[in-house]
Regions:
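N-terminal cap/lid segment of alpha/beta-hydrolase-fold proteins
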Residues: 23-48
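Catalytic nucleophile-loop/oxyanion-hole region of alpha/beta-hydrolase
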Residues: 63-65, 92-122
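Alpha/beta-hydrolase fold nucleophile elbow
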Residues: 122-132
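Short beta-strand/loop motif that positions the catalytic acidic residue
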Residues: 234, 240-242, 246
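Catalytic active-site module of serine/aspartate enzymes centered on a nucleophile-bearing elbow/loop
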Residues: 272-301
């Protein structure tokens, strides 16, 4: 399997390319811990200039990494939030075979491990988890399993349903039985943003992982079924955000899942005409402001 050493990171200014914050680099640090699969998990940390008023953990989506959330990070820091962003196993600067996982729930277990580090470094601080796309599914799985790990949850464009033909699913399950680590390039992941500059940066990102293994594809289908079956365990406060023109996940699936969540404090915000990555789309100021306002009302005020 490929490890973190197989990628040319030294020549790549990872934390400055995506984090456009003007805060001093002394407030940014990088570290690793060992995952439940015994591979190194890379994460980044940003601290505000002033006192910490809360913590936001970022859980990234498929193929990407925790360094692509600079637009969100630069809005959180002035509000007094410390930010921790993980790279899941098999993605970004973490170890493991690219695009592979033995059990999808391992992602949630790794976020739980990072949460332990966060709690030790920021004792007594309220914690929120922000998950996008596949990271939204991971966050829902995490919230259902470890509801006490966070004080509130933000889920953007969660991958709660996949559109696959029965024949394709059968073929994937067959390949998974014979050769689970077989890698295949995914068909187009859809257009993430209406901003051509964001699309260009995404497509040129040397850390982007365009492949998934048969095991991974079977595991995400299993996880989607499990998370939907356990929807009653989804705790609040919870904020969901969805662009109506998203062509990566299914907007109607987000609505359907949200309506089944029993939490009293739950909010669904939709953005007309927005694509998949609300935080990187044209007009991103609106969803970013909504996220900040929602967090402040529950974690600070």
């Amino acid at each position: 399997s490929l490890g973190v050493q197989d990628f040319p990171f030294r020549a790549y200014f990872y934390h400055t390319r995506y984090s456009k914050t003007e805060h001093p680099l002394t407030q940014h640090s990088e570290a690793t811990f060992t995952s439940v699969a015994n591979v190194p998990i890379f994460y980044q940390k940003w601290l505000p200039d002033g006192p910490v008023r809360g913590v936001v953990m970022i859980v990234h989506g498929l193929g990407e990494h925790g360094g692509r959330y600079g637009n969100l990070v630069e809005r959180l820091l002035p509000e007094g939030y410390a930010v921790y962003a993980i790279d899941h196993q098999g993605f970004g600067r973490s170890g493991g075979q690219r695009g592979h996982v033995n059990h999808f729930h391992d992602y949630a277990k790794d976020v739980h491990r990072l949460n332990g580090l966060v709690r030790a470094e920021q004792p007594g601080q309220p914690v929120a988890v922000f998950g996008h796309s596949m990271g939204g599914l991971i966050t829902l799985d995490y919230a259902q399993t470890y509801p006490k790990d966070a004080d509130c949850w933000v889920v953007q464009a969660p991958a709660v349903r996949a559109e696959m033909s029965a024949l394709l699913v059968f073929a994937l399950r067959l390949v998974n039985l014979v050769r689970p680590t077989f890698s295949m390039e995914r068909p187009g992941d859809g257009v993430i943003s209406r901003d051509p500059e964001e699309v260009r940066r995404f497509e040129e990102d040397p850390l982007f992982v365009p492949i998934s293994t048969a095991r991974w594809l079977v595991q995400i289908l299993t996880a989607q079924k499990r998370v939907k079956a356990s929807v009653a365990a989804t705790s609040g406060p919870l904020l969901m955000l969805q662009g109506t023109a998203d062509n990566v996940v299914i907007p109607a699936a987000t609505q359907e899942f949200f309506e089944r969540i029993p939490a009293a404090d739950r909010t669904l915000l939709t953005y007309d005409g927005y694509y998949h990555e609300l935080h990187n789309d044209i007009g991103k100021e609106k969803p970013l402001s909504d996220i900040i306002g929602w967090l402040n009302a529950r974690m600070v005020e």
